[in-house]
């Protein structure tokens, strides 16, 4: 059984190699004392209290006059307008908003009408408190909040002439290296490898992620023996030059998760996502403490303080806020900055739907502590273009758009044909 330090040392070496922390910090992390832990807690609280949004260039109130939810086919669009006629557009997670839209219409959108959009960041807390909205905390509330935040950020960007990345502290990079992810489970290892080959052919990606286990399955595999065979076969097929990640989607208890993790270590995988039940923080930590492979998690977490626990206690090595499930860019960047303060990495979880691939790229561009590759799913049916980016994965990279707001144009005909969604 490997001591917990082995994982810290493994992660520390990776961080040092990436230039994200110094070797001195690595050594000090290994020899952490109670005083160090108290100091870390203070740093995390300081990060949570530090503003993310930068709107200093807007010296007059930006009063929101309306916030609409529009639907075109299976896609939604949020349109926010000011009393002066300025407009911002956001594309929410339609996969979930189709079920939760009454919360958006009845609780989220009305709250923002009449408010100064420049105060978006403190308003997120006021919205949480307003009308007992905190009782709805979870995906149902935060997907709706993210939908509103995206549109307001686009509005603020267009009014200030700044990109969303600039509003959030500045993009550190325009070229984002991506990994392609398979959502398959239950097919044979041979069929899955053929699918992964096609993803690489289509994108030029130098990193891949696929699924293990059976999803919340109490150790059951989707097919008998699939996981073990697939872990080996993918590495043997793509060789050591391909970076490999794998996602268990809460499939295992601690013992089984460690067993699978050991196999992933043998085949030199780069991270192991959500090995145990996502809400069993202690189980995930117990697994991570026994493995050298970095453990990633946080996709389902909707609380800043849930992430604070993970980071403070080293429950994971890589935090994965979902930009929709966690309520938008601002809240997710707080998580990333807490992780950075603790010497951990961050990568956005991409829940698919809408323009999630673009959201993930913008977020990754703003990180001081990204993993080398960011998830890309560019299979949108929304007609969108950019003058500064193809919005496609080319040679394993996506180029971040420049320009105000999201830096994109959604076909005006698509917007004009979208039907307002009203409360019932």
Predicted regions and their residues:
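Conserved, mostly hydrophobic/aromatic
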Residues: 85, 148, 161, 208, ...
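Metal- or metallocofactor-binding catalytic centers and their adjacent structured scaffolds
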Residues: 42, 87-159
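C-terminal segment of N-terminal export signals and the immediately downstream linker at the start
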Residues: 24-71, 87
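Glycine-rich, aromatic-flanked loop segments that form ligand/cofactor-binding clefts
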Residues: 149-185
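C-terminal extensions of enzymes
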Residues: 14-17, 384-424
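Metal-dependent enolase-superfamily TIM-barrel catalytic cores that perform enediolate-based chemistry
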Residues: 174-290
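N-terminal secretory signal peptides and thylakoid transit peptides that target proteins
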Residues: 1-18
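Shared catalytic-loop signature of beta/alpha-barrel
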Residues: 115, 122, 136, 262, ...
């Amino acid at each position: 059984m490997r001591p917990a330090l082995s994982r810290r040392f493994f992660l520390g070496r990776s961080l040092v190699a990436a230039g994200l922390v110094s070797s001195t910090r690595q050594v000090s992390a290994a020899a952490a004392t109670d005083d160090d832990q108290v100091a870390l807690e203070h740093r995390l609280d300081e990060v949570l209290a530090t503003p993310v949004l930068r709107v200093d260039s807007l010296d007059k109130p930006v009063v929101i006059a309306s916030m609409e939810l529009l639907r075109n086919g299976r896609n939604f669009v949020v349109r926010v307008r000011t009393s002066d006629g300025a407009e911002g557009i956001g594309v929410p997670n339609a996969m979930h908003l189709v079920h939760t839209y009454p919360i958006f219409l009845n609780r989220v959108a009305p709250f923002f009408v009449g408010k100064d959009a420049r105060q978006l960041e403190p308003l997120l807390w006021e919205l949480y408190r307003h009308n007992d909205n905190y009782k709805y905390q979870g995906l149902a509330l935060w997907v709706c909040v993210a939908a509103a935040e995206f549109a307001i950020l686009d509005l603020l960007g267009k009014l200030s002439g700044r990109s969303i990345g600039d509003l959030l502290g500045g993009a550190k990079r325009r070229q984002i290296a991506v990994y392609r992810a398979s959502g398959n489970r239950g097919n044979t290892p041979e069929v899955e490898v053929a699918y992964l080959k096609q993803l690489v052919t289509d994108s030029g990606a130098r990193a891949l992620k696929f699924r293990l286990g059976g999803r919340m399955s109490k150790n059951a595999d989707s097919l008998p023996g699939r996981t073990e065979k697939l872990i080996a076969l993918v590495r043997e097929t793509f060789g050591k030059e391909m970076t490999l990640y794998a996602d268990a989607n809460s499939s295992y208890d601690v013992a089984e998760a460690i067993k699978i993790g050991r196999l992933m270590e043998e085949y030199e995988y780069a991270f192991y996502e959500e090995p145990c039940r996502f809400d069993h923080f202690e189980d995930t930590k117990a697994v991570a403490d026994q493995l050298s492979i970095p453990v990633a998690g946080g996709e389902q977490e909707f609380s800043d303080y849930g992430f604070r626990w993970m980071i403070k206690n080293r429950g994971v090595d890589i935090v994965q806020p979902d930009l929709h499930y966690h309520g938008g860019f601002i809240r997710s960047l707080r998580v990333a900055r807490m992780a950075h303060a603790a010497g951990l990495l961050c990568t956005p979880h991409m829940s698919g739907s809408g323009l999630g691939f673009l959201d993930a790229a913008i977020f990754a561009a703003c990180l001081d502590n990204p993993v080398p590759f960011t998830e890309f799913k560019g299979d949108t049916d929304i007609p969108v273009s950019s003058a500064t980016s193809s919005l496609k994965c080319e040679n394993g990279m996506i180029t971040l758009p420049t320009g105000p707001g999201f830096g994109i144009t959604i076909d005006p005909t698509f917007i004009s044909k979208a039907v307002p969604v009203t409360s019932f």
